[in-house]
């Protein structure tokens, strides 16, 4: 189980957070990934036996989708925010629910394709 957690955490390190972006956005984006994906998936793989292999294709797809969703979240916080001042906490709060929902959907998809049994 420990090797599964290590593999999963290594995968999460591949998610690209642009550190030049505003800290309020970065904190929110990272917390979303942690709470909606990393913690639930880590708890799940802790229960796996050693004869279970994590699907690299599935994990790669998760990283790609998370990076896409983060960009949409950033757009909602910045240039696509029309109802409030761009880069404001109001824009961030307006964009956050759809970001968290999208991460939850990615978690569901990832849970379905996460494992393959070793023969």
Curated annotation (Swiss-Prot):
Gene Ontology, cellular component aspect: extracellular region
Keywords: Complement system impairing toxin, Disulfide bond, Secreted, Toxin
Iron-sulfur keyword on record: no
Disulfide bonds: 58-113, 81-91
Compartment list: Secreted
InterPro entries in the record: ALL3/gSG7_salivary-like_helix (IPR056799)
Keyword Phosphoprotein found: no
Pfam families: Aegyptin_C
Molecular function terms from GO: toxin activity
Activation and inhibition: The activity is increased in the presence of host properdin (CFP).
Role noted for this protein: Salivary protein that inhibits the alternative pathway of complement system activation in the host while having no inhibitory effect on the classical pathway. Inhibits activity of activated host C3-convertase complex C3bBb (C3-CFB). Enhances accumulation of C3bBb on immobilized properdin.
Name the UniProt record assigns to this protein: gSG7 salivary protein
UniProt organism field: Anopheles freeborni (Western malaria mosquito)
């Amino acid at each position: 189980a420990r090797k599964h957690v290590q593999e999963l955490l290594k995968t999460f390190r591949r998610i690209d957070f642009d550190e030049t972006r505003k800290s309020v956005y970065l904190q929110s984006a990272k917390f979303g990934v942690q709470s909606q994906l990393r913690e639930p998936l880590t708890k799940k793989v802790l229960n796996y036996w050693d004869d279970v292999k994590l699907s690299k294709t599935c994990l790669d797809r998760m990283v790609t989708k998370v990076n896409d969703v983060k960009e949409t979240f950033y757009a909602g916080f910045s240039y696509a925010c029309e109802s409030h001042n761009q880069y404001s906490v109001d824009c961030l709060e307006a964009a956050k629910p759809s970001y968290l929902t999208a991460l939850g959907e990615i978690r569901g998809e990832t849970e379905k394709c996460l494992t393959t049994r070793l023969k």
